[in-house]
Amino acid sequence: MSKLLLVDDDIELTELLSTLLELEGFDVETANNGLEALQKLNESYKLVLLDVMMPKLNGIETLKEIRKVSNVPVMMLTARGEDIDRVLGLELGADDCLPKPFNDRELIARIKAILRRSASPSNNISNVEILSFDGITLHFSHGIATYNEENLNLTDYEFKILCLLLKSKGNVVSREELSLEVMEKPLTPFDRSLDMHISNLRRKLPKRKNKPSWFKTLRGKGYALVT
């Protein structure tokens, strides 16, 4: 049974969602603000559902604090039409963003998709335990990436993007392939979430000696590892 942390200041909605999630077989704990969520945060949670608009500490600030100490998958619950919240959430390392009001079945489907990915970091991407390149090492059994033995603190999406690029050995990996393999959905014209995850990955990777970057963008084609 997967344990979830649901964070929302709307007590009535929290109770309704808790009931829904428990009927789907999840073990749900709740928090009504960001400070309470941070106090409860521990390694036993498989996913955090995090509302944006909350008193004391809003969802964006709470996400920042979570990412300082944990790579637990986070789904942001945003107000419909508030694109800035969605963009900020993805930039700060959220795994997904779902606008309110949402369809119950879509919420459950997205939660299960995130849990599938996080449960198997090497799912459909690699059948080896370790993959190394120029100081970077991917540890598939733990789903972590290190550089010179220092944890890069990548999210699940960032880890899988880096894995595909390292395995490509300099060949182009299309945006369509990244979307299907990493996010398990086809690429759509106006969805910029993949670009946000790639941008976050670039920021987390250290500077390379004698080379401008770890991977390059090929306009209209995709991305390729700089070997």
UniProtKB/Swiss-Prot annotation:
Phosphorylated. SMART domains: REC, Trans_reg_C. It is found in: Cytoplasm. It holds the Pfam family Trans_reg_C. It comes from the Bacteria. Residues 3-115 form the Response regulatory domain. One of its GO terms (molecular function) is phosphorelay response regulator activity. The keyword DNA-binding applies. The modification 4-aspartylphosphate is found at D51. Its main location: cytoplasm. GO terms for biological process: regulation of DNA-templated transcription. PANTHER family: REGULATOR OF RPOS (PTHR48111), TRANSCRIPTIONAL REGULATORY PROTEIN CPXR (PTHR48111:SF39). Member of a two-component regulatory system. This is Transcriptional regulatory protein CpxR homolog.
